[in-house]
Amino acid sequence: MPLNEVSGNAFPRTVLFDLDGTLLDSAPDMLATANAMLAARGRAPITLMQLRPVISRGTFRIIAVAFPELDAAAIQGLIPEFLQRYEALIGSVSKPFDGVEMMLHALECAGTVWGIVTNKPEFLARLILPLLGWTSRCAVLIGGDTLAERKPHPLPLLTAAERIGVMPTDCVYVGDDVRDIQAARAAGMPSMVALWGYRSHEDNPMTWQADTLVEQPHLLSRPDVWPST
């Protein structure tokens, strides 16, 4: 029996994950960063409830929540400060979502190769890997600035598959944002929505045309939950 077959059900040969909101609950670190910027200006902090729905939308949206009165140019001007402060705080309070380690262990035991494709700047994503013990386990890491394009463009997913040495159709991509699913569909990869991630009230994953929607990470420890590749 091949390594990735268990009781007649197969894990995928390769799985690619989004990072923030899929593998990592990074909202606490980002909240601390935004509130440090507010405190430096003598302003009141924001709450996790305010910030959580936009975490997957990137730094610009996070700053926009913290400083709603600013125009786009002013928000853009604060991005370097946010990234510098975030780099100093990264990993201090964030952790994998419950069930993620169980899932990764099950994949590894089945012989499945896994990697990360995120829109987070690559240097920040690489800082996280050793903190979680993932450096040698993660087969590929593509950040939002690694290539000329980022999600929802398919290039990051296609490049990740190429670097691992598999066809895109042999991969499954798991993410919590509509751009993740758009990128996977454009790359020809089966996709799964991580419903535990960072979504706003306006988001409706049922309309994203993913292959599967999954409620919790631990469910992905079962081979029968995964779409066929």
Curated annotation (Swiss-Prot):
GO molecular function terms attached to this record: metal ion binding; phosphoglycolate phosphatase activity
E.C. numbers: 3.1.3.18
Family: Belongs to the HAD-like hydrolase superfamily. CbbY/CbbZ/Gph/YieH family.
Role: Specifically catalyzes the dephosphorylation of 2-phosphoglycolate. Is involved in the dissimilation of the intracellular 2-phosphoglycolate formed during the DNA repair of 3'-phosphoglycolate ends, a major class of DNA lesions induced by oxidative stress.
Keywords: Carbohydrate metabolism, Hydrolase, Magnesium, Metal-binding
Pathway the protein acts in: Organic acid metabolism; glycolate biosynthesis; glycolate from 2-phosphoglycolate: step 1/1
Name this polypeptide is given: Phosphoglycolate phosphatase
UniProt keyword annotation of Transcription regulation present: no
Cofactor: Mg(2+)
Single GO biological process annotation from the record: glycolate biosynthetic process
Binding of Mg(2+), residues: D18, D20, D176
